[in-house]
Amino acid sequence: MLAPLPDVSLTDPAPSLSPLQWVGMQGIDLPVTVAEPGYWRELHARADVQVDLPAAHVKGIHMSRLYRQLDSLAEESALSALALRHALQAMIDSHLDCQSRSARMRLSLDLLAQRPALVTHDLSGWKSYPVRLDATLAQGVFQLRLQVGVGYSSTCPCSAALSRQLLEQGFLQAFAGEPLVEPDQVASWLRRHGTLATAHSQRSEAQVSVDLACDAPDLGILPLIARVEQALGTPVQTAVKRADEQAFAALNGRNLMFVEDAARRIQAALEGIYARPRVHVRHMESLHPHDAVAWA
């Protein structure tokens, strides 16, 4: 007859009698399903899960029990606030012998969405958006927060003004003394000298986080991304042809922005619609070896 396997987490006393705020695991690979109107996809996530350990005399928690609850979550038809709450409650219930009363989970994943070209018909590509979900159930109170990352292009307003000045000076010098300049002369000069100076622009990124309602039918990831991209006006593109690149250049020209402008645009687009919106933007400067950043 096989002897029972020892469990030192139950039999060995803790070396010092003190409660622990959180104990658990980080970086667990997990398949999850994200389903929203017009979108359904199984994605790879990494999960961090912990419970509190208020029982000072208990040596350790039961990691495998947390793992089982994550497996159950992966089998859900789709991620939702309700599914996350149920998973956290099950983690707490599985640790009654540890007197646990709180549990938390973080899911990090990349959401893939197909994006059409700006102009060219039947041309599209896939774009990845980093997404993070932070769910906490503490003393019976459930909280869920969503964070998304959005890439965009930013063109410096100051650099654009300096470039326009050089273009103006070049034009005046080229046609100095001519009482009448024909439109085709202007067009010809612009074709040759329109890039006499160009404003510096760079790839930029925004991190936006909001609270989600505990009874929300879905996570609303794509609507949040769409609102941020619309506020900025220059989301980075996927597949493009020359016509799309030209349209993107026009968008950048109409949406000159400092890092402060970007943060304020996003904040204004979220206020009154989402609870506790927070914004962090970063412009990876092409003029400088450092980044410009702002928080709202």
Curated annotation (Swiss-Prot):
Residues forming coiled coils: none
Name this protein carries in UniProt: GTP cyclohydrolase FolE2
Organism lineage string: Bacteria, Pseudomonadati, Pseudomonadota, Betaproteobacteria, Burkholderiales
Annotated site location: May be catalytically important: 156
GO molecular function: GTP cyclohydrolase I activity
EC code(s) of this entry: 3.5.4.16
InterPro entries given in the database record: GTP_cyclohydrolase_FolE2 (IPR022838), GTP_cyclohydrolase_FolE2/MptA (IPR003801)
Catalyzed chemical reaction(s): GTP + H2O = 7,8-dihydroneopterin 3'-triphosphate + formate + H(+)
Pathway: Cofactor biosynthesis; 7,8-dihydroneopterin triphosphate biosynthesis; 7,8-dihydroneopterin triphosphate from GTP: step 1/1
Pfam families for the chain: GCHY-1
HAMAP family the record matches: GTP_cyclohydrol_B (MF_01527_B)
Keywords: Hydrolase
Family: Belongs to the GTP cyclohydrolase IV family.
GO terms of biological process kind: tetrahydrofolate biosynthetic process
Primary role: Converts GTP to 7,8-dihydroneopterin triphosphate.
